[in-house]
């Protein structure tokens, strides 16, 4: 069956308003995470400009804490979720990638908009950098004797700021309720709701999909799950500067699991085009 891919250069909120109600089978997206300046109004030029500044003054993304972030994300995602709720068919799924720190805002927005939170999928990976920072540079600026500084640095040499190395991204699995219909009756009416477990995963391709998706072989327990590596330079493309590119294999897996052949899949946020 030929694949019909259509790309629209538009504000996603405004474009989604033009879609017919109950016309979408699956929404699968990697939205702005609203961490630091990475919100719905973020500028690539502004973000790239900050990277040229000092590492200490301008901390890496995700290390600054602003209580307004979660409120801004919730408000924006509630508006989006309420709009998508009308466009999805009953039993249609809304899958949203997020960060562990702000996942709750996305899940709550989907819930309040009317969706059922059916599950959370964890995409686990090990190719990540530690974010916790040493406090040595702060101690060196403190008003105390050189000897006291040396002693304090030694005492806290193994302590870092409270950012645990992140090795997973959560995916919120929300579903538009099917009302009083059974899943099979809803399936016959809309071709949505039931999951396609025909694809087998794991090392031996003999396991049904789980809610943990890993990037590599950890041990026997993790081997039972679906292994998906982060995309390398070849898959990303030479000119792709997007900071959170998702693997094609991961997106393919989710589309096959949560939709059928011929389904209409919507991604409100283009990102790098995965």
Language-model segment annotations:
Residues 3-274:
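Core catalytic lobe of class I
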């Amino acid at each position: 069956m030929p694949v019909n891919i259509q790309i629209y250069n538009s504000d996603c909120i405004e474009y989604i308003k033009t879609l017919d109600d109950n016309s979408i089978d699956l929404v699968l997206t990697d939205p702005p995470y609203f961490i630091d300046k990475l919100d719905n109004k973020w500028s690539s030029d502004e973000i790239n400009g900050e990277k040229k500044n000092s590492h200490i003054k301008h901390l890496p993304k995700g290390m600054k804490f602003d209580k307004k972030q979660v409120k801004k994300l919730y408000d924006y995602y509630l508006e989006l979720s309420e709009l998508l709720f009308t466009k999805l068919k009953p039993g249609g799924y809304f899958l949203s990638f997020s960060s562990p720190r702000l996942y709750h805002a996305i899940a709550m927005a989907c819930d309040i908009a009317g969706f059922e939170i059916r599950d959370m999928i964890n995409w686990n990976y090990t190719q990540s950098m530690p974010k916790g920072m040493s406090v040595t540079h702060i101690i060196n600026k403190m008003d105390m004797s050189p000897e006291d500084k040396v002693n304090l640095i030694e005492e806290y040499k193994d302590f870092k700021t409270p950012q645990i190395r992140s090795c997973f991204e959560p995916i919120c699995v929300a579903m538009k309720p099917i009302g009083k219909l059974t899943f099979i009756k809803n399936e016959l009416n809309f071709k949505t709701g039931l999951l396609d477990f025909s694809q087998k995963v794991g090392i031996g391709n003999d396991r049904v999909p789980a809610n943990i998706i890993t990037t590599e072989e950890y041990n026997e327990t993790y081997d039972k799950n679906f292994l998906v590596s982060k995309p390398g330079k070849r898959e990303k493309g030479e000119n792709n500067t997007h900071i959170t590119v998702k693997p094609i294999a991961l997106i393919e897996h989710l589309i096959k699991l949560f939709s059928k052949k011929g389904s209409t899949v919507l991604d409100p946020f283009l990102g790098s085009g995965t």
